[in-house]
A protein has these predicted regions:
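Glycine-rich, aromatic-flanked loop segments that form ligand/cofactor-binding clefts
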Residues: 122-152, 172-196, 217-242
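Mid-to-C-terminal alpha-helical segments outside catalytic/metal-binding sites
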Residues: 372, 376-399
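DNA-contacting surface of Y-family translesion DNA polymerases
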Residues: 59-116, 129, 143-146
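N-terminal low-complexity, Pro/Thr-rich disordered segments
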Residues: 19-69, 78
């Protein structure tokens, strides 16, 4: 442990003590069985008091078992263009065929219209047979990567360069949580855990990395995650097993990226920050679309059972929700269309599929492919329902 890391450990412990008891880990290993949705950990208010999970009204008769289409839809995060949610998205939500919605700048640019859109989506969910709130999410990393105006205004690099970086990270996480919660959102696709290897490389170019030392990155992202979690917003740590060595311009959104990191480097650097951030309350882990030959030379991480099941679930011990990066990414061009990509990711062990092409039809195609794969046995029912159960447990603890 470097002197700087020892210093950050002390700062982190001090910050957590000042904020009260840290939240129960949302995705870390536990000796007990995974909780049912009704028993999932609750979110917290800004004061740290428990927020009870949303529960359904008493029903006169048992709720019918979900259809294959509903189970499949609950694994999809939809997106849409512009300020107004389209009718087909509202219908999917109302019929229990949606897991969540991701928002981009074209959705949020008009605050009044965005507030109306969130109300519409929440009202549609209240009419749904699914008892839990939608996962309403965006990328609010800080600095140059923000979909909502306001906090956190500091980038990850600026946080790491602060006089008290752990305190700055906690303030950034709290600011992100309050900002999203005020807008009616309950999931942040942040913080970034990538440990950058060279100044100006892909992840450092927009100041998205908290540092070059994995111990520092683990401490700072843990502080960010814990503070955000206390505001009632679930954190997503990304991009497993790490994009820190990607050179400038190596963007998986645009095309294939292969990172030839040795296995020891992947584990001692790229994956090293994850246990601390998961223990601090991260409810989701996003998989990278890069290829890592040390783990799987044939498939991007998010399509690789080796990466998802053996590294993340097995070695790291993560039991929460796994989420894909953008399903429309250029790095997946060789892996078929939307439906084929969705089934391949689900087969690898990814729970939640991010259909972020600003087109509801993309999510509907992915859901249809999942439902067909469930019906014909391509995807095993036990694994499929386990993924839905993890998503429902996450939703049950949010507002």
């Amino acid at each position: 442990m470097t002197p700087r890391t020892r210093y950050l450990v002390v700062c982190l412990l001090t910050a957590l003590a000042a904020c009260g008891t840290p939240p129960r880990p949302a995705g870390g290993p536990t000796p007990a069985a995974a909780p049912s949705p009704a028993a999932a950990p609750s979110a917290t208010t800004t004061q740290g008091s428990a927020v009870p999970p949303i529960t359904p009204p008493a029903a006169a008769s048992p709720t019918p078992a979900p259809t294959a289409a509903q189970l499949a839809g609950r694994r999809i995060v939809y997106s849409y263009p512009g300020p107004v949610p389209p009718q087909d998205l509202l219908d999917a939500v109302r019929e229990g065929r949606a897991g969540g919605v991701i928002f981009f700048s074209d959705n949020t640019i008009d605050p009044a219209a965005f507030a109306a859109a969130v109300r519409q989506l929440r009202q549609a969910q209240q009419q749904s047979p699914v008892r839990w709130p939608l996962l309403l999410m965006t990328d609010q990393e800080g600095g140059r990567v923000r979909r909502l105006s306001g906090a956190p205004e500091l980038s990850a690099r600026q946080v790491s360069e602060a006089a008290d970086p752990v305190r700055a990270a906690a303030e950034a996480g709290a600011g992100a949580g309050r900002n999203l919660a005020a807008a009616g959102l309950n999931v942040n696709l942040a913080p970034v855990l990538d440990v950058y290897a060279a100044p100006g490389n892909f992840i450092d170019a927009k100041q998205r990395s908290f540092g070059k030392d994995p111990g520092d990155v683990g401490m700072l992202t843990a502080a960010f995650t814990a503070a955000q979690h206390r505001e009632g917003v679930a954190g997503t740590v990304k991009h497993f097993p790490g994009l820190g060595t990607a050179p400038a311009g190596a963007n998986t959104d645009e095309g294939p990226v292969t990172l030839a990191d040795p296995l020891t480097e992947l584990r001692e650097v790229g994956e090293a920050p994850y246990p601390a951030a998961i223990a601090a309350g991260a409810g989701l882990v996003m998989l990278s679309w890069a290829v890592y030959p040390a783990l799987d030379a044939e498939r991007p991480a998010g399509l690789s059972p080796t990466v998802v099941q053996q590294e993340l679930r097995g070695r790291i011990g993560f039991t929460g929700v796994t989420v894909s990066d953008a399903l429309e990414a250029g790095s997946l061009a060789a892996f078929g269309g939307t439906g084929q990509r969705a089934v391949a990711a689900a087969a690898a062990g990814v729970d939640l599929l991010l259909c972020s092409g600003r087109d509801t039809a993309q999510g509907l195609r992915a859901a249809e492919a999942l439902a067909d794969a469930l019906a014909d046995g391509t995807l095993a029912r036990d694994g499929f329902t386990a993924a839905v159960d993890r998503i429902d447990a996450l939703r049950a603890g949010l507002r």
